Regions:
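The feature encodes the CheY-like receiver
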Residues: 59, 88, 107
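Acidic, metal-coordinating helix/loop segments flanking the phosphotransfer/catalytic sites
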Residues: 33-51
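C-terminal output helix
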Residues: 90, 108-117
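Active-site residues of response regulator receiver
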Residues: 55, 84
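Two-component/phosphorelay signaling modules centered on CheY-like receiver
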Residues: 14-32, 98, 120
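Acidic catalytic/metal-coordinating carboxylates
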Residues: 36, 62-65
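Conserved acidic carboxylate
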Residues: 11
Length: 125
């Protein structure tokens, strides 16, 4: 098992997930990507995740379903962060209720995402 922090990017847009992969790999992280709820759950169960960057609008449904399934399997990531294009209080409240450490409005500038990731990973929450 690698000592590099494992970042799982749950994103169905290949350009976005590819950019996040490069961003995190170049800054010393081990990165997995998954385009769907099923793929995200499969990766997280097989390989414990330090930071989950979770798009709420996955092609096969509500991204928060990932957290529900991982909780059932006892495989929740150390830190889960929701990424959404919807800046609505009820969306943020749902994310928090499901255990998200933070909710970021897309698009998230790369520097901001990296700075926040360092904070989340150093605190573990």
């Amino acid at each position: 098992m690698s000592s590099l922090p494992h970042v799982l990017v749950a994103e169905d847009n290949d350009l976005v997930s590819g950019a996040m992969r490069v961003l995190f790999e170049e800054t010393g992280h081990r990165v997995s990507t998954a385009p769907s709820i099923a793929a995200t759950v499969s990766v997280a169960v097989a390989d414990p995740v330090d930071l989950l960057l979770l798009d709420l609008g996955l092609a096969d449904g509500d991204g928060l379903e990932v957290l529900a399934q991982l909780k059932e399997r006892g495989a929740l990531p150390r830190v889960s962060v929701a990424l959404t294009g919807r800046d609505e209080p009820e969306v943020v409240a749902r994310c928090r209720a499901m255990g998200c450490t933070d909710v970021l409005l897309k698009p998230v500038p790369a520097r901001q995402l990296l700075a926040r990731a360092r904070e989340w990973l150093s605190s573990g929450t």
